[in-house]
Amino acid sequence: MMTRDRDPVTPLLLVRRAAVAGERDVAALLSEVPLDAVEVADLMRHHRVVVLSDLTLPSAAPPVAAAAFRIHRPAGTAELAGIGVAVHLRGRGLASRLLTGALMLLRAEGLERVQACAAPGGAGASLLTSIGFTADGGTARADGRARLVLPL
């Protein structure tokens, strides 16, 4: 079935909060960030992890991408802890689609800004700046990564 102005091979995708039952799949997606399974479990239970699901697959299929955020409610901020896309699906814009949806969810929860860190000139920095993140004027990180911020 093809809908108007939609490529028939582009799957229908849904951004949703990650379910604890899918913790192992989320940890696998975020393992290169690197976030270990213990940290992923903490982020899923106490902060926010969102996933991108392919609606053309069975409901038990693992998500195709995941993004984890540390939520700081008193400050009204979230920090992007990491984002991961299934290896065989990279380079198709899924990270951008996931982050765009995640940012809308965070805004709906009342958060006011999202912070992130990325290597200058790297793919992560390129992704973040393409969706509106800008350099944070604060001090540079000791590991050389740039601090970025996006007001919601």
Question: Would you name each region that the model predicts?
Answer:
Residues T3-D5, L13, R17-A81, A86, ...:
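Acetyl-CoA-dependent GNAT
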Residues H47-V49, D143-R147:
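Short hydrophobic/aromatic beta-strand or adjacent loop that forms the aromatic wall/cage
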Residues I83-R90, A118-A119:
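A short, internal acetyl-CoA/4′-phosphopantetheine-binding micro-motif in the GNAT/acyltransferase core
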Residues G91-M104, S130:
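Conserved acetyl-CoA-binding loop-helix of GNAT-fold acetyltransferases
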Residues L106-A119:
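Conserved GNAT acetyl-CoA-binding A-motif
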Residues A116-A125, R141-D143:
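Conserved beta-strand-loop-alpha-helix junction that forms the acyl-donor binding cleft
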Residues T129-G138:
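Conserved acetyl-CoA-binding loop of GNAT-fold acetyltransferases
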